[in-house]
Amino acid sequence: LICLSGKKITYDSLVVCPGIQLDWNKIEGLKDNLGKNDVSCNYSYESAPYTWEMIKNMKKGTAVFTNPSSPIKCGGAPHKIMYLACDYWQKQGVLDQIKVHYVSGAGVIFGVKEYAETLKGMLEKYKIITHFQSDTYKIDGEGKTLYFRTKLNKDQLAENFKSSN
């Protein structure tokens, strides 16, 4: 991520959830990078197995999981893969070497209050860094950079996800 202030945050793998209609063109560069360059989406039958390969192969660095502000097929899907990844990394003894970011178009972790409290505990347990009210708008796969806008402060951010396994 590169904030307007110049602050930078990097990551190694990116899992993108683009929305309910699977409009791969909504995010610039997503279609061209899906299933390669450490970019995957569990809503793509073809690239979902690649998500698991990225998770299994990651030993250190930064992982970014996204959830758009637009409606999606399953509101819990972006959470599920993120928590499964964190649990896997914890069991492998590498979670402390991985910085996990959650970029979400929503203003809260989950819209159902009863579940939100439990999920807040998961964020704390895995030390997940959250970016609420933020939407991905561009991916540069070869440059290993994700760009997103935040509604909270109008910053345009970029996240570098160079592999450092």
For each feature predicted by the language model, list its residue ranges.
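A Rossmann-like FAD-binding core segment of flavoenzymes
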Residues: 1-2, 90-165
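Short hydrophobic core segments
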Residues: 10-21, 159-165
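Glycine-centered loop/turn positions within well-structured domains
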Residues: 9, 22, 61, 137, ...
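Glycine-rich, N-terminal phosphate-binding loop of Rossmann-like dinucleotide-binding domains
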Residues: 5, 18-19, 67, 150
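Rossmann-like dinucleotide/flavin-binding elements
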Residues: 23-110, 159, 165
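Short, well-structured alpha-helical segments in soluble
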Residues: 2-8
